[in-house]
Amino acid sequence: MPVTVVDHPLVRHKLGLLRENNISTKNFRELANEIGRLLTYEATKSLPTEKKTIHGWAGPVEVDQLVGKKITVVPILRAGLGMMDGVVDMIPGVKVSVVGMYRNEETLEPVRYYVKLAKKIHKRHAMILDPMLATGGTLVATINLLKEAGCRRIMGLFLVCAPEGLARLEKEHPDVEVYTAAIDERLNENGYILPGLGDAGDKIFGTK
């Protein structure tokens, strides 16, 4: 399974700021979007382009333009919305598909409560957004949904990942590409990532 840890000084610095326990909602939102933007840069660098001649200020000029399948960004509600603006900044015309999942705190398994996918999603590459890949249950359920809808190329963008979640993804969907700012140490007994970020959804939305 292709896993890319985006090892860049800016990413490491911004992730370090995100880990501060008393970070403000404003700063957490801004940093999550900034890292999302940097992850998008890495995740899209293999997109195909073609040469096209346009009319420049001094006459015809040959440029590169994206070609091929379009992308749909898939934020997993609610925390995935905290990375979406950064991605949309990089790909302004991207279509947004929304998947609502929450994790049952007792079983740690995902529960789906809302789905709204882009039209002709089977013709698009899907880019899943979720700040944290913990047990992998929510991610696997989302990938199952997208594959059932016809998606053939799926990637996931995460601020931090747990080894346990990556192992589950490797077992169930080894074809999915992962882009992350860090792979953390482990999950605790409650299924939270250590050292992690705390509850990313609460920090993004200012709730508890």
UniProtKB/Swiss-Prot annotation:
EC number of the protein: 2.4.2.9
Cofactor-binding details, from the entry: Binds 1 Mg(2+) ion per subunit. The magnesium is bound as Mg-PRPP.
Gene Ontology MF: a single term: uracil phosphoribosyltransferase activity
Name the UniProt record assigns to this protein: Uracil phosphoribosyltransferase
Residues involved in uracil binding: 193, 198-200
A GO biological-process term: UMP salvage
Key word Magnesium present: yes
Keyword list, A-Z: Allosteric enzyme, Glycosyltransferase, GTP-binding, Magnesium, Nucleotide-binding, Transferase
Residues the entry annotates as binding 5-phospho-alpha-D-ribose 1-diphosphate: 78, 103, 130-138, 199
Activity regulation as described: Allosterically activated by GTP.
Name of the gene: upp
Pathway this chain belongs to: Pyrimidine metabolism; UMP biosynthesis via salvage pathway; UMP from uracil: step 1/1
Cofactor(s) essential for the protein: Mg(2+)
Catalysed conversion reaction: UMP + diphosphate = 5-phospho-alpha-D-ribose 1-diphosphate + uracil
Pfam families in alphabetical order: UPRTase
InterPro entries associated with the record: PRibTrfase_dom, PRTase-like, Upp_B, UPRTase/APRTase, Ura_phspho_trans
